[in-house]
From Swiss-Prot:
Species per Swiss-Prot/TrEMBL record: Stenotrophomonas maltophilia (strain R551-3)
Cofactor annotation remark: Binds 1 Mg(2+) ion per subunit.
Keyword match RNA-binding: no
Pathway: Amino-acid biosynthesis; L-methionine biosynthesis via salvage pathway; L-methionine from S-methyl-5-thio-alpha-D-ribose 1-phosphate: step 3/6; Amino-acid biosynthesis; L-methionine biosynthesis via salvage pathway; L-methionine from S-methyl-5-thio-alpha-D-ribose 1-phosphate: step 4/6
Biological process annotations from GO: L-methionine salvage from methylthioadenosine
Protein name in UniProt: Enolase-phosphatase E1
């Protein structure tokens, strides 16, 4: 069935895993203590700091919260509060021109082609929605955010949970079988397939030197880049 909507992951799918791990994560980790000290009383920041403090045992100093968050970065923990605070820190970095977001070279032309043909694009990433908008807005291919019709993060649910995709289907208001989900993570594709979505495994050699074929792909159609996605 021809998809009517594209839903895409970011890290490892549109963009290199190494950019996130080697540029964005270290930038946020280094900036966290000063950012918390400077902005900790702002309501949006306070909300997330308090959420972390509650999780680690109640009232505690912001410096301890910052250390905890740095530890979560080291563990690559997908925590909503961490993602939100990282997004606020990355906002400053993008706007100062400290970096631009990496996109694989074929992605922007393909996304523009889909947009021109009237195929809506949605993003679902473990990064917060504000961070996603920055990623697309300050990309090395220019501002790609106008190509995106909607954004989803882990506030709608975990990416390896079928119910998350069911909620996305309800939000988009298109039958699940007419939505194509793109990701580099087989377990995410499994969850999307369970919810009725079409799937493609993005298996980039830069990120996965050993091709994931056969059982490793778990029945998902495999492509190595966006140009190979046949619609």
């Amino acid at each position: 069935m021809q998809p009517r909507v594209i839903l895409t992951d970011i890290e490892g799918t549109t963009s290199s895993i190494s950019f996130v791990k080697n540029v964005l994560f270290p930038y946020a980790r280094k900036a966290l203590p000063a950012f918390v000290a400077e902005h900790g009383q702002q309501p949006e920041v306070r909300r997330w700091l308090d959420a972390v403090a509650t999780e680690i045992g109640g009232a505690c100093q912001d410096s301890l919260v910052a250390e905890t968050l740095q530890g979560w970065i080291d563990q690559d923990r997908k925590h909503t509060a961490l993602k939100a605070l990282q997004g606020l820190i990355w906002d400053e970095g993008y706007r100062r021109g400290d970096y631009t977001a990496h996109f694989y070279p074929e992605v922007a032309p393909v996304l523009k082609g889909w947009h021109a043909s009237g195929l809506p694009l949605y993003v679902y990433s473990s990064g917060s929605v504000p961070a996603q908008k920055l990623f697309f807005g300050f990309s090395d291919a220019g501002d790609l955010s106008p190509l995106v019709s909607g954004w989803f993060d882990t506030e709608i649910g975990g990416k390896r949970e079928a119910d998350s995709y069911r909620r996305i289907v309800q939000a988009i208001d298109v039958p699940a079988g007419e939505i194509l989900f793109l990701s580099d993570v087989v377990e995410e594709l499994d969850a999307a397939r369970e919810a009725g979505l079409q799937t493609r495994l993005i298996d980039r050699l830069d990120d996965y030197p050993l091709p994931r074929t056969g059982q490793a792909a778990n029945g998902h159609e495999r492509v190595e880049n966006f140009q190979q996605i046949q619609l």
